Amino acid sequence: MYLVREIMHCKPGKVGEMIKRFKQMQPLMKEVGMTESARIMTDMAGGEPFWTLVWEQETPSLEKYLDLTRQTMSDPRMQKIMEGYHDFVESGRREIYKVE
């Protein structure tokens, strides 16, 4: 099992728009079996910059994660939801952990 985190540092005041988009994505991801354990988190305090959003999910294998990611990102509905999201994000990264 693996834990994947997509971490985005949003522009000031734009984290709400990204939360809205991720919530719109969830039903589409669920259609392909991708969001069993997915959750959206935002920063409260600590080492991350303000306006940080984290999308976290577990996957049984990295191959399955990559296949489902390709499948959802080729969906025109997903493309419409994510259109222009770079206007809301300053930077980001992906973290992948093996669950022991």
Segments (PLM) and residue ranges:
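An amphipathic, aromatic/His-enriched active-site/gating alpha helix that lines ligand/cofactor pockets
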Residues: 21-39, 58-95
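Short, well-ordered beta-strand segments in beta-rich or mixed alpha/beta enzyme
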Residues: 2-9, 39-72
